[in-house]
Amino acid sequence: MNRTFSLRRKVKKSEISTPSNFEHRIHAGFDARSGTYTGLPKQWQALLGPPRSISRPKPMVDPSCITPVDVAELKTVIRGPSSSFRYNSPLPFGMTNSPMPSVARSNSLRISATASPVVNVSSARHSFRPTLPPVSQRGYPFNDPSYAPLPLRNQKPPMSTTFGVEKPHQYQQIITIVAPSRTTTPQLQPKSPSTPQAMRQQPKCTEGVSDEEFRNALKFVVDGTDPRSDLTDYKQIGEGSTGVVEAAYKISTKQIVAVKRMNLRKQQRRELLFNEVSILRQYQHPNIVRFFSSHLVDDELWVVMEFMEGGSLTDIVTATRMTEPQIATISRQVLGALDFLHARKVIHRDIKSDSILLKRDGTVKLTDFGFCGQLSEEVPRRRSLVGTPYWTAAEVIAREPYDTRADIWSFGIMLIEMVEGEPPFFNDQPFQAMKRIRDEHEARFSRHAKVSVELSELLSHCIVKDVNKRWPAKDLLRHPFFAKAQHSSSIAPLLLQLQGNTINGNNPPTHHHSSQITTVIQ
């Protein structure tokens, strides 16, 4: 025994050599200015997802108060780096020999974050949830245990609402087939903060229609032709939770078009597909993005629309400084589209710079109609909480009945965007911003903003909590400020300046805020 121990003590440990031919290929760092990691391998960066500062706030739907006729769910705003959209070519004012001229993001051509940011909400808040499908099937923000709707003041039971229109249209009848109205709105009762386990135990709602029934209903609002024979040279320029967006060359008209491709079987709420298609199909206006056609291709819905090569207004407000004549020129066109919609009792409910697209000649057009609401004599106001928090009207956040003038509040916030580069309270988390919008005084231009008396007065007619004092779009168009408006071509220098920043490697600056999540509340 002793001999054995002595032998063990004499055994020499093998020496481990130092590393040889060592190469340090990864040099990770942290950029404090942008709040992002640098030098990470692509696989690691994919796990982290894109930084919050790249993503614009993304609409989300509050399930606690949904009018039965409203079909608005979580909408992914497709958005991406400006350098990825332009086919690596300059922005000419004339067509080139190539069938694919230089283009910028357009018509919801915005790439969304692959990993949705988490809304930071105190777990002490109560959660109000009606009978809805399990959160595991509904995705962000519903499967986030920290998510809860905004607490209300003097909450009253929601009124039951039925859908009615003055002049029924075919698409509205189809929507009734797909998403039949309930006679009463579910009563909302407070619950303790939900844990992931409790959320998984929620009862499951049965689907109203089968895949085949939905497909048959959708055939009433789409063209019966196959668009693939007339489209070529596809180039994916966007991707979101509803599908992908591609630029394509339309052979018959020899033009670039935007094609949204949405898989019917992968939609969290398929009936939402009716909303944008129906609005674009029915309403044509010089300042509304042009709709060409929609098609059922296998299990996908294809929507072919005008390609807006100038990009979104967001690119301009974050990268350039606009003059008041340029602000007036853009605002006049936006109000023209709103006046057209409001005269037809349509509420857009998501007015912001992301929803405003431009042509290369400076023409401004309104897009993103997935959250529209239709009013009628039977339903003169809506109650559903819909909108992007920083732009949402105070009465919408307070869940009071609202009408088309809710869009005017959002338009006023967009005026502040064009002057200051971002909406008020953008440093706050979405729900904190909503509380401030609801409880504090109306937002105004900052003291450092050098604006004219006319522009300040215009803003005061838009952002006012007394809805009766808020001017409609047709009255705003007659405001003295719009005497400064010029021809749409006056916007072209902004697009050239934006293009120059991209060519020189200076991408348009993004808002570096932790609250870079867009929150839309329905």
From Swiss-Prot:
One record GO biological process? intracellular signal transduction
Name the UniProt record assigns to this protein: Serine/threonine-protein kinase pak-2
What CDD domains would the database entry show?
A: CRIB_PAK_like (cd01093)
Q: Which Pfam families match?
A: PBD, Pkinase
Instruction: Explain the purpose of this protein.
Output: Serine/threonine-protein kinase which plays a redundant role with pak-1 in embryogenesis but, in contrast to pak-1, is not involved in commissural axon guidance of ventral cord motoneurons or in distal tip cell (DTC) migration.
The record's statement on gene disruption is: Low level of embryonic lethality (< 15 percent) which is suppressed by simultaneous RNAi-mediated knockdown of max-2. In pak-1 and pak-2 double mutants, defects in embryogenesis and L1 stage lethality. The few animals reaching adulthood are smaller but have normal ventral cord commissural motoneuron axonal guidance and are relatively coordinated.
Fetch the SUPFAM superfamilies from UniProt: Protein kinase-like (PK-like) (SSF56112)
Catalytic activity field: L-seryl-[protein] + ATP = O-phospho-L-seryl-[protein] + ADP + H(+); L-threonyl-[protein] + ATP = O-phospho-L-threonyl-[protein] + ADP + H(+)
Q: Which organism is this entry from?
A: Caenorhabditis elegans
Top-level taxon in the UniProt lineage: Eukaryota
**What Gene Ontology molecular-function terms does this entry list?**
ATP binding; metal ion binding; protein serine kinase activity; protein serine/threonine kinase activity
Q: Gene3D superfamilies of this UniProt entry? A: CRIB domain (3.90.810.10), Phosphorylase Kinase, domain 1 (3.30.200.20), Transferase(Phosphotransferase) domain 1 (1.10.510.10)
Biased-composition ranges, Polar residues, are: 183-204
The catalytic activity of this protein is classed by the Enzyme Commission as: 2.7.11.1
- According to its UniProt record, in which tissues is this protein expressed? Expressed in pharynx, vulva and spermatheca. Unlike other p21-activated kinases, expression is not detected in neurons.
Give the record's family classification: Belongs to the protein kinase superfamily. STE Ser/Thr protein kinase family. STE20 subfamily.
